[in-house]
Amino acid sequence: MTADTQIPRATAQRLPIYYYYLSSLHEAGIKRINSTEISEAIKFDAATVRRDFSYFGALGKRGFGYDVSALLDFFSKVLSQDKLNKVAVVGTGNLGQALMKYNFVHSSNIQIVMGFDVDPKKKELKIDNEKGETIPVYSIGDLKSELNKENVTIAILTVPGKSAQEVTDQLVDAGIKGILNFSPIRITVPNSVRVQNVDLTTGMQTLIYFVDNFENIKSAK
C-alpha cells in the first residue's frame, strides 16, 4: 500500500474488526486461515473480505490462504497499534464518566488522559479507570491549554446537542484532528478534521425494526 492508495470508508471501518479477530486467532495458536473462514466468523461475505484485503496488495496466496501472524502484523501497522493515541472526553456526565472509567481497557494504543466539563463542581473531579489510572477533569475554559500540554489530537464528544457545535469549534481551534461524536446532532468541521458519529438511539431503533420485521426481511432475500 502506498500513501496515494485510496481506501473506501466502509473498508476502513472494517479494519479494526479484522485486526481483533486475527488477534484472537493468534492467541489461540492458529497459523493459517482463508477468506471463507474469516467470512463465517465475522459475518462479512468472503468476496468483501477478499476485496478489502486487495486494497493492500498481495496479503495471501491462492490455495494457501493467509498467514495469521503476518496478516496480524500488517494490520497492526496499518492501524498504528504501536503508537499511543491520547484521547480527551468532553462532557463528563454519565456517559462521559463511563467511557473514562472503561478507558479502552482491552486496547494498548488508546488512552483517555483527561476530561472537560462546563460544570465548575467537576473541575477537581478525578476518575479512576479500569486500568488503575486516575484521569483528571478540567474546566472547559482550559481546553486548549490542557490539550496542547499532552499533545491530544482526538476527542470524544458527549455533550448535549445544544452545545455540541460550540464545543466542536473550540476543539478544532485547539488542534483536534478527530472527534468521536456521541452528541445527538451532526457537527460541522473543516475538511482537515475527521468525525465518527455514534448515535445510540438510531442504532437501537434500527435493531428494533430488524427484530420486529425479521421474517419479512428474511423472506425478501
From Swiss-Prot:
> What Gene3D superfamilies does the annotation carry?
NAD(P)-binding Rossmann-like Domain, Winged helix-like DNA-binding domain superfamily/Winged helix DNA-binding domain
**Looking at the keywords, is Metal-binding present?**
no
* Source taxonomy: Bacteria, Bacillati, Bacillota, Bacilli, Lactobacillales
Q: Which locations, inside or outside the cell, does it occupy?
A: Cytoplasm
Give one Pfam family.
Put_DNA-bind_N
Chief site of localization = cytoplasm
Record has Nucleotidyltransferase as a keyword: no
Name of this protein: Redox-sensing transcriptional repressor Rex
* Molecular function per GO: DNA binding; DNA-binding transcription factor activity
Q: Which gene encodes it?
A: rex
One GO process term, biological-process aspect: negative regulation of DNA-templated transcription
Q: How does it assemble?
A: Homodimer.
Provide the function of this protein. Modulates transcription in response to changes in cellular NADH/NAD(+) redox state.
The UniProt keyword set, sorted, is: Cytoplasm, DNA-binding, NAD, Repressor, Transcription, Transcription regulation
For this protein, the DNA-binding region equals: 17-56
